[in-house]
Curated annotation (Swiss-Prot):
Family from the record: Belongs to the LolB family.
UniProt keyword list: Cell outer membrane, Chaperone, Lipoprotein, Membrane, Palmitate, Protein transport, Signal, Transport
This protein's encoding gene: lolB
Pfam family membership, one: LolB
UniProt signal peptide: 1-18
Protein name (Swiss-Prot/TrEMBL): Outer-membrane lipoprotein LolB
Lipid-modified residues, N-palmitoyl cysteine kind: 19
Taxonomic lineage from the root: Bacteria, Pseudomonadati, Pseudomonadota, Gammaproteobacteria, Vibrionales
């Protein structure tokens, strides 16, 4: 608790100055085709903003996410560009590098981020969810464009609801695939608003 409080107290001046399978679900041919395209995405880079709201804290951070099958790196920065958190995930576990050069490791990335910052973010599932692929979801719904509208997932006995409110067409392998531009994650009184401003796919 002391480490977490100290972490955000040190950041406060900076803020002031500036594959599990898919669930059984009725699907259309269009969704199956879209899902197949998403499954071909092995690596991506996503740049955007994350807003975090809970009874304990509110944070607005920029993020840069570089993901590949071998390693995933998620970096949060303040609006001044100061690195707040640098998370690296591999099949062997997770490592966090903080703004003051602390390095902490754990088997579970979500637990490590929460321990250090108090932020509850299901980062291990987000690599699929942020591209609109409901891997591991307990249930999901499609919109009229046959892309993901929402999904539900129980994690550690807590129900997460993810809503997709906007998509953007992104070039991938000489074709266009719609990817999420705005989504929100809700778990009881915790809410995360994610806006992806730039996608790069490989």
């Amino acid at each position: 608790m002391f480490r977490r409080t100290y972490f955000w107290l040190m950041l406060l001046p900076l803020f002031m100055v500036g594959c599990t399978g898919l669930p059984d679900h009725p699907t259309s041919v269009e969704w199956q085709s879209h899902q197949a395209k998403l499954s071909q995405i092995q690596s991506f880079q996503a740049v955007g903003k994350l807003g975090y709201i809970s009874p304990d804290q509110r944070q607005n951070l920029n993020f840069y996410w570089k993901h590949s099958p071998e390693q995933s790196n998620l970096r949060f920065t303040t609006f001044l560009g100061q690195t707040a958190l640098n998370l690296t995930m591999t099949p062997q576990g997770a490592r966090v590098e903080t703004y003051d050069d602390q390095i902490l490791t754990a088997a579970n990335a979500t637990a490590l981020v929460q321990q250090l910052t108090g932020l509850v973010i299901p980062v291990e599932q987000l690599s699929d969810w942020i591209i609109g692929l409901p891997n591991g979801a307990d249930d999901f719904q499609l919109n009229e464009q046959n892309t993901l509208s929402s999904l539900e997932k129980d994690l550690n006995f807590q129900r997460w609801h993810i809503a997709y409110t906007q998509y953007r067409d992104v070039e991938f392998h000489q074709q266009v695939v719609p990817l999420p531009a705005k989504l929100s994650l809700t778990q009881q009184d915790i809410k995360l608003n994610i806006v992806v401003s730039k996608w790069t796919l490989k």
